[in-house]
Amino acid sequence: MSKSPVAIIILDGFGKRAETVGNAVAQANKPNFDRYWANFPHGELKAAGLDVGLPEGQMGNSEVGHTNIGAGRIVYQSLTRIDKAIEEGEFQENKALNNAFTHTKENNSDLHLFGLLSDGGVHSHINHLVALLETAKDKGVKNVYIHAFLDGRDVAPQSSLEYLETLQKAISDLNYGAIATVSGRFYAMDRDKRWERVEKAYKAIVNAEGEKFEDPIELVKASYANDKNDEFVVPAIITKDGKPVATVKDNDAVIFFNFRPDRAIQLSNAFTDKEWDHFDRGANHPKNIKFVTMTLYNPSIDAEVAFEPIEMKNVIGEVLSNEGLSQLRIAETEKYPHVTFFMNGGRNEEFPGENRILINSPKVETYDLQPEMSAYEVTDALVEDIKNDKHDAIILNFANPDMVGHSGMLEPTIKAIEAVDENLGRVVDLILEKGGSAIIFADHGNSETMSTPEGKPHTAHTTVPVPVIVTKKGVTLREGGRLADVAPTMLDLLGVKKPAEMTGESLIQK
């Protein structure tokens, strides 16, 4: 039977900004997007700050965006939740955190804090690290060591010195704690199974393998002199009196304070997996460690979780499933967790009637080297699916504007957007031919701002609104929409009643 599918099409990191300088979205030749914008109802959505459950003025990101999109309601994000717990004293009494503290006291061992050192608020926040230091000291933990992962991606490419100085000031004010290793997130926070990167971070933390420096500031300066910005700092060791400050040993405790799961999973696995074949962990692989993660990274990780997920009922996948509608989730590797796990409110398993297609992202060092990424392959698979009338609802993510946008390079990002536009045309025209409709929008901004006012590369997300197009004639879109309104709009287009839990509203004016 012929289907008229309704699709959610996410152009990841494709924000809306009037200024054209440094704006890859404005400068790209995108005839398909422009044609839909000219011919169909369109507007903009808020995708940052309070509108997605983040602190005011905080830029959106893919995890938060997809969670809000799938939930059809504003979802209180981990960042806000942990901030609130610190403020209200719950953090200090958190069971999992206290179990880590107790473990070190019972074993006369050390506590190690892993995580991304910045205030980017995408994967972590430096305030949470400082709160952990204060709490561990209050609770009588003898020694605490920090394994700092440098950012340079959700914040400026060379901003780690200020975060290291903030951390060193906290250490000095508390007279407690020390930095043991420093690593760029490229190594410690890989998510694409490039195990040789993770291995470098792991071996620095466990074996003190890597270049040695007495001062983390000197380490970073040496890296800059070597043309390696924060993200790419090779894992290195901090020494005192010629000896490594600390390594993770048997009976120690680890708290991984990143709250966003996807880039914390692989390193966590390296420490906790019983069965392991990705690289040789060596004779020093620590035994009997207490491993605590700030949030649930993956149910398969043998760790205690400080902030368990809040279960969400009636997310878009569940509603479609309960209505007996078939649904497809499709993306390449980099955004596959977003259209599945995050879209399903932190649930890994498929709902009945939900199918998934994963297309591998290209194995290149950085995506500016291949700006089209796997957009053509994703589209080939989807076109085949639509032609065969497989699904009533489709959730598609094009990763390119975001992943190439993170390079801070304008030209490759323009190419990325042009590749996406070509493929967007193939998908949407086919959906329209089938009598279906699409909601085309972004989860957050990025590629519309590729340079700072000073003309330096801008690699982070932004707080700008995102464009939205609903490819249905004869309807009007209301103003003031946000990401939480997308799922109700999809249900509206499918003729399905919105459940009470979805507090977002359809964008289509009644």
From Swiss-Prot:
Binding-site residues for substrate, renumbered to this chain: H123, R153, D154, R185, R191, R260, P261, D262, R263, K335
Cofactor(s) recorded in Swiss-Prot or TrEMBL: Mn(2+)
Listed GO biological process terms: glucose catabolic process; glycolytic process
EC identifiers of the protein: 5.4.2.12
Binding site for Mn(2+) 2: D12, S62, D443, H444
Binding sites annotated in the UniProt record for Mn(2+) 1: D402, H406, H461
Keywords: Glycolysis, Isomerase, Manganese, Metal-binding
Function statement: Catalyzes the interconversion of 2-phosphoglycerate and 3-phosphoglycerate.
NCBIfam families, per the entry: pgm_bpd_ind (TIGR01307)
Family: Belongs to the BPG-independent phosphoglycerate mutase family.
Full protein name: 2,3-bisphosphoglycerate-independent phosphoglycerate mutase
Organism: Listeria monocytogenes serotype 4b (strain F2365)
